[in-house]
Regions:
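Active-site neighborhood of phospho(di)ester-bond hydrolases with catalytic His/Asp-centered motifs
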Residues: 61-64, 81-88, 117, 229-232, ...
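Conserved beta-strand hairpin/beta-sheet module of binuclear metal-dependent hydrolase folds
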Residues: 27-76, 111, 170-172, 179, ...
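Active-site-proximal loop/helix segment associated with metal-binding centers of metalloenzymes
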Residues: 41-43, 152-242, 249-251
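Binuclear metal-ion centers of metallo-dependent hydrolases, dominated by the metallo-beta-lactamase
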Residues: 145-146, 238-345, 357, 371-372
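Metal-dependent catalytic neighborhoods of phosphoester/phosphodiester hydrolases
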Residues: 95-103, 127, 297-306
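Short, positively charged low-complexity motifs
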Residues: 11-13, 361-362
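Divalent metal-coordination and catalytic microenvironments
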Residues: 31, 71, 87, 114, ...
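Active-site metal-binding motif and surrounding structural segment of the metallo-beta-lactamase
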Residues: 57, 65-115, 137-142
């Protein structure tokens, strides 16, 4: 299928693989929470969407209604490189047509790759009449559970989750990094400073004054990369535990309180306690609860979770979590969304939202105007 616009600009929807090309450099890794609510957006929580930034690459996971506005209110209109859909329920998908069209109206030229379960192609094709003509290339890639999508120094792995429709979770898994270079040992082995040092750090042997020098002679132990896991909508399942084992951050569905466990099971969602139990079994460093309904008080949600797994947070829209390399510290909140510049000045809060605004968001940073 090809949609064409006027003039020279056109789009081809292709079905091959498209890999981003990034320069090799130390990579920051962060998650911006654009939508943390349930199926119905509220004044404080939008529908599902997460923006993962790693180095120079931007990966969007799900694109609920209003995602582009959430971007513009916090980060600006981010030119994402790839979009990953967990499934095609409306609250995870309805923001896509508008985002694609806005990119066109702002004269985007760089290609965009969209990944998702089977049915992605048909769904995007059916939106052609709504979106109209757009002038950049879009690659549509339908994936299966267990696929690994290469990124620089990492891969995004899909895994099956248990929801009411075909659904995936995603794990961003970095490869181990080389150990630290020991220049003193290299000099002692007769390696010249300069290009030979760089060659060794790339993992290639060089000739020293005393004979061949292997990188293992001058490099420390390999350093682990980071793992970030996003479940999308799911009941608790073994596949999530395995994908998240030892992860820096697990972002897990927490749609229901414990008293509604049967409803969670019937609809393919998790209770707060079930999400916490998955995190505990997987031994993750930090659990972030999302898909939280506005009918629950966030304080109650966190109390239930922390009874099972203490390092749990309930991010609000616009919160940003930074994931440093393991040797540099733990995942941490670096920006809190409960800030006046990101709050609509006029909406009337429901009783649940008013309670949330008064009692904080569980991240240790009170909303504006509240006591410490």
């Amino acid at each position: 299928m090809a949609l064409r616009s006027g003039g020279a600009r056109s789009i081809q929807l292709s079905y091959g693989r498209s890999l981003s090309s990034l320069s090799s450099r130390p990579m920051d890794l962060s998650v911006a929470f654009l939508g943390t609510g349930g199926a119905v957006p509220s004044a404080r929580r939008n529908t599902a969407s997460l923006l993962v930034s790693r180095g120079g690459e931007r990966l969007l996971f799900d694109c609920g209604e209003g995602t582009q506005r959430q971007m513009q209110r916090s980060l600006g209109l981010v030119q994402v490189d790839s979009i990953f859909f967990t499934h095609f329920h409306a609250d995870h998908f309805l923001g896509l047509p508008g985002l694609l069209k806005t990119y066109d109206l702002t004269e985007r030229e760089r290609p965009l790759t969209i990944y998702g379960p089977r049915g992605l192609r048909d769904l995007i094709q059916s939106l052609g009449r709504v979106i109209g003509r757009i002038g950049y290339k879009v690659d549509l890639i339908e994936i299966e559970p267990g696929e690994a999508i290469p990124r620089e120094g990492a891969e995004v792995r899909s895994f099956p989750v248990e929801h009411s429709v075909r659904s995936f979770g995603y794990a961003l898994v970095e490869r181990d990094r080389p150990g630290r270079f020991d220049p003193a040992t290299a000099k002692r082995l007769g390696v010249r400073e300069g290009p030979d040092f760089a060659t060794l750090q790339r993992g290639e042997a060089v000739q020293g004054a005393l004979g061949p020098v292997d990188p293992r002679d001058v490099m420390g132990e390999s350093r682990p990369g980071r793992t970030l896991v996003i479940t999308g909508d799911t009941a608790p399942c073994h596949a999530t535990v395995e994908a998240a084992r030892g992860a820096e951050l697990l972002i897990h569905d927490a749609s229901f309180a414990e008293e509604e466990a049967q409803r969670a099971a019937d609809t393919g969602h998790s209770t707060v306690g079930q999400a916490a139990a998955v995190a505990r079994e997987a031994e993750v460093k930090l659990l972030a609860l999302v898909h939280i309904s506005s009918r629950y008080h966030v304080g109650k949600v966190l109390d239930e979770a922390k009874e099972v797994f203490e390092p749990t947070i309930a991010p609000r829209d616009f919160d940003l979590i930074d994931l440093p390399f393991p040797e540099r510290g733990e995942p941490r909140l670096v920006q809190n969304g409960a800030r006046e510049r990101n709050e609509d000045p006029s909406p009337k809060l429901s009783s649940e939202e008013s309670h949330e605004e008064t009692h904080g968001d569980g991240l240790g940073v009170p909303p504006p105007g509240t006591a410490e």
